[in-house]
């Protein structure tokens, strides 16, 4: 398959031209169903809507049709990182400090290859997690094979998109919707 770093260099300017930040570029599916996955987001909202996905997909397709950087047939998938998003950039650790993450390591650290915990701190070289029953664990970023946010009520609340189009009134903590929910009336 094609070199991810080289593909990222081609995709990044297309995302930037639309005001988007790349979150991840990856190949999945193997030879039977090769898929180039591109995750991007708006830096101000950390989200991506359908129009953004369509625009970025068209720009990438046009660029790849011109340069043909991938020899074999593949499927292009452009999406938002989602709520339980991967943590792929140094800035992600600071942006999501205080939220829970699952970190999988390339090699064991203190006899473990996976840690689930709250993101406590990051310094660009490592991340510190508050891990239940272990306390704080500091993991060098270079040892992380993959990491993602863990879906929690706090994460759902923090990332819920709120469209008020056509809404007359916003009622928070509506009793028939449950505590912490927002009901739009209009």
Curated annotation (Swiss-Prot):
- Quote the subcellular location field of this record: Cytoplasm
Keywords, A to Z?
Cytoplasm, Ribosome biogenesis
CDD domains given for it?
YlxS_C (cd01734)
Main location class:
cytoplasm
Q: Looking at the Swiss-Prot or TrEMBL record, what is one Pfam family this protein matches?
A: DUF150_C
Report the record's Gene Ontology biological process terms.
Answer: ribosomal small subunit assembly; translation
An example of a Gene Ontology cellular component annotation for this protein is: cytosol
Q: What's this protein's function? A: Required for maturation of 30S ribosomal subunits.
In terms of PANTHER family, this protein maps to: RIBOSOME MATURATION FACTOR RIMP (PTHR33867:SF1)
Q: Which family does it belong to?
A: Belongs to the RimP family.
What protein does this entry describe? Answer: Ribosome maturation factor RimP
């Amino acid at each position: 398959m094609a070199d991810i770093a080289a593909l990222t260099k081609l995709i990044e300017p297309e995302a930037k031209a639309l005001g988007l930040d790349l979150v991840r570029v990856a190949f999945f599916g193997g030879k039977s169903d090769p898929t180039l996955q591109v995750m991007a987001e708006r830096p101000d909202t950390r989200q991506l809507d359908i129009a953004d996905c369509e625009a970025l997909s068209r720009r990438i397709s046009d660029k790849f049709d011109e340069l043909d950087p991938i020899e074999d047939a593949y499927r292009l998938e452009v999406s938002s990182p989602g709520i339980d998003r991967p943590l792929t950039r140094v800035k992600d650790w600071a942006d999501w400090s205080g939220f829970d993450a699952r970190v999988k390591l390339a090699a064991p650290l203190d006899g473990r290859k996976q840690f689930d915990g709250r993101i406590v701190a990051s310094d660009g070289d490592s991340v510190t997690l508050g891990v239940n029953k272990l306390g704080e664990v500091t993991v060098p970023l270079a040892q992380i094979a993959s990491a993602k946010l863990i879906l929690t009520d706090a994460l759902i609340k923090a990332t819920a998109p709120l469209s008020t189009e056509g809404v007359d009134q916003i009622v928070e903590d509506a009793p028939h919707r449950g505590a912490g929910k927002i009901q739009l009336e209009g």
